[in-house]
């Protein structure tokens, strides 16, 4: 199962993704697509990136902060992961924490 943790603490945002969606390559590919798209966007934006960790073992963590652009990027990635969980809850678990 893929486990996703999303956190908004003021203007600081955390996106963490761990594990493979064993048994469903489509969910695994979709989760990877979402996290790598966000990482690419962050690299090309003016948003402050505190941490970027992406590895080949299905683990990723992005921590970033900023204003409206960072918030919009976070909202978009949350929507993507929550929609994925809605369609495939047996393969992906998403926790959204707003502090």
For the regions a protein language model found, what residue spans apply to each?
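N-terminal intrinsically disordered, cationic/polar leader segments
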Residues: 1-27, 35-99
């Amino acid at each position: 199962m893929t486990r996703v943790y999303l956190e908004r603490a003021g203007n600081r945002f955390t996106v963490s993704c761990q594990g493979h969606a064993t048994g469903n390559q489509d969910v695994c590919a979709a989760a990877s697509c979402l996290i790598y798209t966000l990482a690419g966007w962050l690299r090309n934006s003016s948003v402050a990136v505190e941490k970027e960790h992406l590895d080949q073992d299905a683990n990723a963590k992005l921590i970033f902060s900023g204003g409206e652009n960072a918030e919009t990027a976070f909202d978009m990635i949350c929507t993507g992961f929550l929609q994925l969980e809605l369609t495939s809850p047996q393969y992906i678990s998403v926790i959204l924490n707003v502090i």
